[in-house]
Amino acid sequence: MDDNALLGQLEELAHSLGIEVRSEPIKKASSFSPGGLCQLKGEYLVILNSTATKEDQIYALAKAVIRFDLTQVYLRPGLREFLDDFSD
């Protein structure tokens, strides 16, 4: 699966879990951040660094969604395999 397809599937998964996904430029003086999960006014939000590579955005989004219980969520086989490998 290519990076664009994987990122798209991760974004769909996040939305199905009630997580808003935003792409914003993150300017951090001391180091680079690809983004991450936060909670704002009781709602989950993933902010992806729009200047990050697709690979870094995939990492940040995967790291966010694996915090949630995915056992009862239908995932395409390629996405489930990726997340299983990612969480190991």
Regions found by a protein language model. Give the residues of each.
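A sequence-level detector of short, solvent-exposed, charge-rich linear segments
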Residues: A29-S33, L40, P77-R80, D84
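Generic preference for well-ordered secondary structure
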Residues: A5, V21-E24, G42-L45, N49, ...
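C-terminal structural segments of small proteins and small subunits
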Residues: L61-F86
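Auxiliary, metal-adjacent structural segments of Zn-dependent hydrolase domains
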Residues: M1-S33
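Short, exposed beta-strand "edge-strand" segments with a Pro/Gly-rich flavor and a Y/T-containing core
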Residues: H15, E24, T51, R67-Y74
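Active-site scaffold of zinc-dependent metalloenzymes
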Residues: S31-E55
